From Swiss-Prot:
It is found in: Plastid, Chloroplast. The gene is cysA. The keyword ATP-binding applies. It catalyses: sulfate(out) + ATP + H2O = sulfate(in) + ADP + phosphate + H(+); thiosulfate(out) + ATP + H2O = thiosulfate(in) + ADP + phosphate + H(+). Gene3D superfamilies: P-loop containing nucleotide triphosphate hydrolases. This is Sulfate/thiosulfate import ATP-binding protein CysA. It comes from Marchantia polymorpha. It holds the Pfam family ABC_tran. GO terms for molecular function: ABC-type sulfate transporter activity; ABC-type thiosulfate transporter activity; ATP binding; ATP hydrolysis activity. Keywords: ATP-binding, Chloroplast, Nucleotide-binding, Plastid, Sulfate transport, Translocase, Transport.
């Protein structure tokens, strides 16, 4: 049950909500839509659901053009941020509503609803009404109702936005398994990049109504098409750069010694020998650095400035004396313990794990974040 979106455009007066967006969602896959507020994510979901019309373009569901077909004939469920629960029905009645309309037997309805109540951890509120529920509970009820009818297609707008911590992590893992087991093609909007990377088969990045990049999470994380996509998906660490308009093949004598050392280092400049350093910014992800506490002649010594303990990682603020370079690197707690840091006076050693740059962006065209 695939979804094809072809050159979909939508405007509100002079404001372009969506600008010729095209993407393909393979059957039974989960696609995550990411982008800043106002990028058109929710608007695109509403057009796919048939709740809004597009000014131009087409929506194809499993090979059928449904652009002008009513929502009720699209075999689709959706969960939007307003939940839209029936106020006069209990939680149990809300979830079973679609099943009763479709004429399922009482036993099948009971089994299906009870299973979803337990999996989503809302069995204890099954006879309460929406007005008695918290935002997180309403969100789970809406999700259970959308899953109960076993749709071919599922559209989710921030399905776990009102949840925190362990419950959110548990339900995201459960939902991914459920969608795979029941072969439901899904498009999910989320502002949680980590959630998108862990759940989605592919990620789509939108900005100002335009699709910037689509691909597998690892590909987008490792090889973002531009600086905006790179920094949006996670921390980018910019390496030191020369201030002269030169190439790596022609380092002038007036270049500061520390930067000359950096520029000549074959580890750092492996594949950009023919590019003008002054016109590009070079970046690495935190995991592409190797940090050691033992002396390593192939690594660069660094000073420890601060250590900040976070919930799932430790943030190291370091200073590379030889390059006059401040950098921040998050590492896991086990990796931090392996460093055996006993004092801020202790010297660490750092080097890139890779001998190529995966990310180099022209300064003038990609320096802006918004």
């Amino acid at each position: 049950m695939s979804i094809l979106i072809y050159k979909v455009s939508k405007s509100l007066g002079n404001l372009k909500i969506l600008d010729r967006v095209s993407l393909y969602v393979p059957k039974f896959s989960l696609i995550a839509l990411l982008g800043p507020s106002g990028s058109g994510k929710s608007s695109l979901l509403r057009i796919i659901a048939g709740l809004d019309n597009c000014d131009y373009g087409n929506i194809w569901l499993h090979g059928i053009d449904v652009t002008n077909i009513s929502t009720q004939y699209r075999r689709m469920s959706f969960v939007f941020q307003h939940y839209a629960l029936f106020k006069h029905m209990t939680v149990y009645e809300n979830i079973s509503f679609g099943l009763r309309l479709r004429g399922f037997s009482a036993q099948k309805i009971t089994n299906k609803v009870n299973d979803l109540l337990n999996c989503l951890r809302i069995a204890d509120i099954s006879f309460e009404y929406p007005a008695q529920l918290s935002g997180g509970q309403k969100q789970r009820v809406a999700l259970a109702r959308s899953l109960a009818i076993q749709p071919d297609f599922l559209l989710l707008d921030e399905p776990f936005g009102a949840l925190d911590g362990e419950l959110r992590r548990h339900l995201s893992k459960w939902l991914k398994r459920y969608l795979q087991d029941n072969k439901i093609t899904t498009i999910m909007v989320t502002h949680d990049q980590k959630e998108a990377i862990s759940m989605a088969d592919e990620i789509v990045i939108l900005k100002e109504g335009r699709l910037l990049q689509q691909g597998k999470p690892k590909n987008l994380y490792d090889q973002p098409i531009n600086f905006f996509v790179g920094i949006f998906l996670g921390l980018l660490i910019e390496i030191p750069k020369l201030n002269e308009s030169i190439t790596l093949k022609n380092i002038p004598s007036k270049t500061p010694q520390n930067l000359k050392k950096f520029a000549f280092d074959p580890i750092w400049v492996k594949i950009f020998a023919n590019r003008s350093i002054n016109k590009y910014r070079f970046f690495l992800r935190p995991y592409e650095f190797c940090i050691k506490s033992e002396m390593d002649l192939e690594a660069t010594p660094v000073q420890i400035k601060t250590i900040i303990y976070k919930r799932t990682f430790v943030q190291l603020d370091l200073f590379v004396t030889s390059f006059l370079w401040n950098l921040t690197i998050p590492i896991g707690y086990q990796s931090f313990r392996n460093l055996h840091i006993e004092s801020f006076m202790q010297t660490l050693y750092i080097k890139p794990r890779l001998q190529v740059f995966l990310r180099a962006y022209p300064i003038l065209t990609n320096i802006k974040k918004n």
